[in-house]
């Protein structure tokens, strides 16, 4: 609902819906009261690898939990989706779908990409490959699926709904 609120004319303030969503998540996971968290202006910290400093990385997600009614629409969307990602993270596939759909939250980049160029380091894996049971068990179906996919059967090929307009520099 809060996602819809910033893209239309809501009957309730988007801040109310945002805070309601965070409070619901806190309640669902029984992690206490959300008030202090919702007032927090803390942002993600840089990752510092003390053993291999070249693996250290600057934080990319720089939005805090505190709602700012004066923030840009895009910043509000980033806050909403980041909180949604946190809330649905235990359901990894759902969290991954949200991140692919919106580009939020902004995640640390892959530092060692072993995909032989099949997966973009910045946008990460976009889909899972078709299972071996289809590839070997029904080659005609596999060929048809690859044709409908519109690209190779790799983790870097975008799905029909994954338009690529969801990543910002």
Predicted regions and their residues:
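C-terminal functional modules
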Residues: 26-169
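Extended, well-ordered alpha-helical scaffold segments
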Residues: 13-23
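Glutamine-centric residue-chemistry signal
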Residues: 1-2, 83
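Short, small-residue-biased leader/transition segments that mark boundaries at the very start
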Residues: 2-14
């Amino acid at each position: 609902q809060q996602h819809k609120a910033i893209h239309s004319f809501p009957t309730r303030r988007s801040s109310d819906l945002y805070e309601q969503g965070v409070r619901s998540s806190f309640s669902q996971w029984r992690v206490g009261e959300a008030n202090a968290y919702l007032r927090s202006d803390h942002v993600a910290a840089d990752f510092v690898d003390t053993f291999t400093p070249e693996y250290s990385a600057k934080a990319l997600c720089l939005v805090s939990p505190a709602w700012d009614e004066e923030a840009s629409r895009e910043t509000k969307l980033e806050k909403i989706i980041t909180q949604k990602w946190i809330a649905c993270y235990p359901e990894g596939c759902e969290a991954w779908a949200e991140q692919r759909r919106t580009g939020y939250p902004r995640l640390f980049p892959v530092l060692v990409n072993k995909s032989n160029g099949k997966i973009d380091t910045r946008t990460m894996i976009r889909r899972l490959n078709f299972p071996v049971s289809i590839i070997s068990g029904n080659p005609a179906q596999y060929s048809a699926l690859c044709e409908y996919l519109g690209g190779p059967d790799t983790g870097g090929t975008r799905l029909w709904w994954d338009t690529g307009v969801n990543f910002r520099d």
